[in-house]
Structures are given as C-alpha cells and as structure tokens.
C-alpha cells in the first residue's frame, strides 16, 4: 500500500506532502501519523498534487515510491512502515503506473528510499501498530449543541479557482512561480522521465511561429533544410575529442537492442558537427560546390545532471542548427552577423524580449570555434543573464580535421608544376537557437496571475467571453451566437480568436483561466454591449479596460494587438536597461550584482582575469557561507563583449584606464553577471 497525504497549510504556503509506504494490512491512521510528524489534518492528496510529486502517476492508484525524482524534493515526507523496512520478504510496488509491478525485499525498499532522499534521516520508519496503541483515546461526546445557523456554502468552483490559480509570487519564490505558470498556463506537462517535458499546443505554437519566421529568412540567404540521423557511432563522436569534451558527461548512449548488448555503443546526438562534416568532405569536391548551407530542425539530447527546468535545462530539446561552408573567411564572417541579427529579431520583434548582441570571451566561446557571437538576455526578477542564441565562426578548424578542402581557384598551372599544395580548407560556421526562447519569454513577461503572451506568438490572441447571462434554458443562446459571430469575424481577418462558450463556468472563472494562460486581449460581450453595439476589451498585460465599437472591430483589434506587442517590449526594455549598469571600480561589482543587476566593466579580456573575476566575486558574495552545489553560482561570469559599445557611454580610453580586476590596460566594455 502506498498513499500520498496532504496536510492542511496556509494557502500561500508550499504543500508538504507525505508519502506512506506500508503493508496492505497495516492500519495507517492519518490522525496519529499527523501528530507524530507535527502536521495538521492529513488528508489523501488530490490528483494535481499526486501529479506534481509523481509525474508518471495518472491517478491515486499509481502512487508509488519508485518513479519519484532523484533526489526527491526536500518538502516531501517519506514514511516507511517498520513491518516493511525490517523484512526480507518480497513486496509488490508499482514501477511507473499501476499497470507495471516489480517485487523488492523490504530491506531493499528501505535502502532505495534512503538513496533518493536528501539524507537517510529523511526516510521516517514508523511502527504503525505502536503508533495506534499510543494514540490518545477519543474524547467523550459532549451534549449536543443547538443547531447553528447554516452558513451559505461556497460554490465548488471557488475551490477549483484556488487550485487553478498561481500559488507562488514571482518576486518571492521565482522557481515555484515558474513551475506553476508553465504547467497551469498549459505550456508543458511532466513526462515520466526526469528532464523531459511534453510541449503542449500553446508552447509549440511559439516554436512554430519562430520556425516560420526564421526558416523563411534563412532560405532567402540560400540555406536549405535537411535531416541527419540522431544516432552517432562512438568512433565518429570521439574523432574530435577537443570539441566533444565539453559534451562528454551529457552524452546519452544506446547500449542494448532488446536483451542483447550492442557491439559498439551508439550515442544520441548532443550536437551534429561530427555527424554532418564527414559528408561535407564527401560532397564538397570543388570551389564550385561552395557555399554549402544546410540547416536542421531537430531535437538533441544532453543528459543534464543538474536540476532540470522546463525550457531552460532539459535532457531533450528542440532547436535548429545551421552548418555552412564557404571558400573565403569574409563570406563566413558576414553570415555569422546576418544570422545573429535574425536571432535578435526573434527575441525583440516576436517575443518582445530585449537582448544584447555581442561576442563571447575566449573562455566562453564554442569549443572549436575561432569566435562565438551571442544574443544575451537578462531576467531582472532573478538578476541573472541568459544566453539566447549563438552564431559561431569555426574558421578552418573542423575543415582541417575532416579534410573538407577544394582546389584553390587562384592557383596557377605554374604552382601545380612546382609541386605547391594548391588545396585550401573551407571556412565554416555553425549556429543554433532552441526552445529555451520560450522560457526566456515566460520569465520576462509573466506575472503573479500567470503567463503574458506577446500577440505575435500567442496561440490565442483574443478570447471572447459571454457575460450578463441569465438562468433558464435557451435564454443565453443569442449572447452565445453573438460571441461566436464576433470570434468568427476576427478569425476571418487573420486574428487568432476563440469564443469561450463552455457551459458550467462563470464569467469570473473564465476570466481567471484566460488570464493565467496569457491571452493578450479579452473581449466581453453581454446584452447591454450587444444593444449598444460595443464590446468591453481588457488587456492582459496591464488589465486596462476600454470599449470598442463592434463596427470595424477586426481593424480596431488588429491595431490594439500591435500596440500591446510594442508596449510589452518597451516595458521589458525599461527594466532591462535599469538592470545593466556600467561599473568602473571593483568595490561596486558585488553590491551591483546583489541588487539583481548585471555589470558592464572596463576589461582587459585576459582569460585568467576572467576566472579571477568569477572566483573573487563569488567569494565576496558568499562571505564564508557554504556553497550549495545545486544553487546557481554567486560569481560573475562573462556574458559577452557588446558590439554596441556606445550603448553604455563613451569608453574611458587612455593608458590610465585599467581593468577593474587587474592592472592591465582595459580594452573594451564587457558585460558580466550571474547567469543561468
């Protein structure tokens, strides 16, 4: 028997669930157990909490200790029946759902639970028979009291509304808030493999919109789409050890087929350079075969061992990866910046997220690249930077390794007769953008009510909600018809609109639902609105309300959506600019970081100095505290060297301008900060 209980807590408090693993015939009385654990009013957990604690569970019948994430959340109490913990008998436990069962010795169950718990002490072994015997006797019943006046009952929908609402505040508990909004806002659902997530239509629409824009633009640059297999032989993956070294701990391997071990292990691609470039060498035989410009829309697997986070740190994610080859460096350099500007447009024009384009430091550039360019975002709520997308110039590093070369078109017959090597290696680029874009958008615009969608990427741009409804069958049909007609008119004009005609839900419940899902604009339509020829419009991002005439409504809404898109970007840009501060003295760096800001500093660009900045800022920020290996670093790392140096004021040139960390001459402004 495995049960999940939920104690009574304050509405604003995070639940502290209790998982009980006991023999089927053990009486697990919740009253004495709650008293032992000092938890009030233990009750069986509802389906949503079960799903949160055990992602693979579809119902209470699927509750099991085996699919728990490792390590389990520190808020979870694990209670193990002493009759199980000390027994060498076999016990049946569900593997992932009630449809699959395994048998383990009781002592092995105890050892397993202790292995996934934050500490062995986190598993509480309880003698339920003794607990029952020591429980206080029930009090004698008092004389019956006069019947109290019956209080009006809350509508069931009130409880639903609380469960549906975002439980965490963005400023107070950002990780809890983020998890809340991506799940309750219907962007993702949890899968039964840790670090893997289901992208629901609202999030996949964002990715499709990005794909449509970006794919159209790169095709104008001469890029063609292709697809290479996801499997990589061990020999091919290890051919470029320097490049793959950074990915080595994250590579997932296929080692079996059925019950048989494979002779050679097969990797699942973490990136595709070593997959694609042998074929570039095969296909590029002459300078006339250049440039070769290919792009893949695919998924890659990087078996992250850190705490996974939807969209930001996942074991499988969707991305595009472009791989191009050119005869000259100048051609390749131009493409690097062309692609980076498209990434900037994705963030700023579609997601309404400001970014800083720049070049990565030597320490932070892509392994095997001559240089890496990037668009860097920043999340003011957490004070951390986040890499948005990268475009790398690989130089001739990979073409030398994979022998991608052509006859130099400038070589003469005399050169050949003289025995000169007339082969030249091609210049290569690679560039990629992933579904991390969605997470950055959520963190930038979301609020305590839920998601806030920029109209350009919203699955639903406008929702029409009927109001002023009456009781009685058929009385509301004219209102429903008017709402559907309004939604159809907007849809015919190319606006993604829907009418919420769900029965059994109040308008207030629907308002909260669509606010949490981030729909940019809500139109309310009732009898008075219909009579007046107007509709009440409510903007999601600031809750501003105004009436629109129904005549010419499509054109009006189209303009308002454009205004919302711009307003979201402008608001985010103001916060972004206020959070990026020029600093010219070391003493101001850590206080600025602690104020949830990034710093722009005069920097010498020396790799050792970069390491020193990271370590020194971490030590000063920690001030002797023990470092939490699971927490993001408190040190400042190089985010990029911005292309637009004038954005931060005139650089203080001259021999007297020193790097803020060392005595070397500073070269440029560099953006440093804490990061994801």
Task: Annotate each language-model stretch with its function.
Residues 1-676:
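NTP/phosphate- and nucleic-acid-binding module
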